[in-house]
Amino acid sequence: MKAFTTLQGLVCPLDRANVDTDAIIPKQFLKSIKRSGFGPNLFDEWRYLDHGEPGMDNAKRPLNPDFVLNQPRYQGAQVLLARENFGCGSSREHAPWALDDQGFRVVIAPSFADIFFNNCYKNGLLPIVLAADIVDQLFQECEAAPGYSLKVDLAAQTVFTPSGQAFLFDITEHRKHCLLGGLDEIGLTLQHADEIKAFEARRRVEQPWLFA
């Protein structure tokens, strides 16, 4: 998993509330269990003018010119700005996979669905909850200023605007530790590799019948 420390990232404003996981990555693309390759189908039903299916050449599909991801000023965005209850609906880890594959490292919203929120942390994506009035302000600033970017400092748990405003956000120490170190659940386990090996060696001596 990629470590997250600080990010200065272009912001893409998705001005929709209650964006569910089927909108983030439609169900027909869930057959793959690889974590890569989902970016071109992120927000597929809004992004393209036709119906997407696995195996289609996305480069040849007609784009929806009104959708934010297709607008030149938001190309290369790493921060997604969203409205309340982002990531609601069915549980699918493919949703943060698709956001990550598109290049997003941070999602900022007033609230998130619980399962999506937890899945983000497991996949190196930082979901940040800010008050609705602050999110409103960020939308206004982003839409008014092409090239609008935010600095996110995870160690300081702070979002900085171009004007220098600072907004604190909450995160548990455990999740912060994992993101700063780029540690998923396997990585956390491997931090205790020596203790695990010592336990297994001790068990072979104390309970040899288990290994006969």
UniProtKB/Swiss-Prot annotation:
InterPro entries: 3-IsopropMal_deHydase_ssu (IPR004431), Aconitase/3IPM_dehydase_swvl (IPR015928), AconitaseA/IPMdHydase_ssu_swvl (IPR000573), IPMI_Swivel (IPR033940), LeuD (IPR050075). One of its GO terms (molecular function) is 3-isopropylmalate dehydratase activity. Pathway: Amino-acid biosynthesis; L-leucine biosynthesis; L-leucine from 3-methyl-2-oxobutanoate: step 2/4. It comes from the Bacteria. Its EC number is 4.2.1.33. It catalyses: (2R,3S)-3-isopropylmalate = (2S)-2-isopropylmalate. It holds the Pfam family Aconitase_C. Keywords: Amino-acid biosynthesis, Branched-chain amino acid biosynthesis, Leucine biosynthesis, Lyase. The keyword Transmembrane does not apply. Gene3D superfamilies: Aconitase, domain 4. GO terms for biological process: L-leucine biosynthetic process. One of its GO terms (cellular component) is 3-isopropylmalate dehydratase complex. Catalyzes the isomerization between 2-isopropylmalate and 3-isopropylmalate, via the formation of 2-isopropylmaleate. Heterodimer of LeuC and LeuD. Belongs to the LeuD family. LeuD type 1 subfamily. This is 3-isopropylmalate dehydratase small subunit 2.
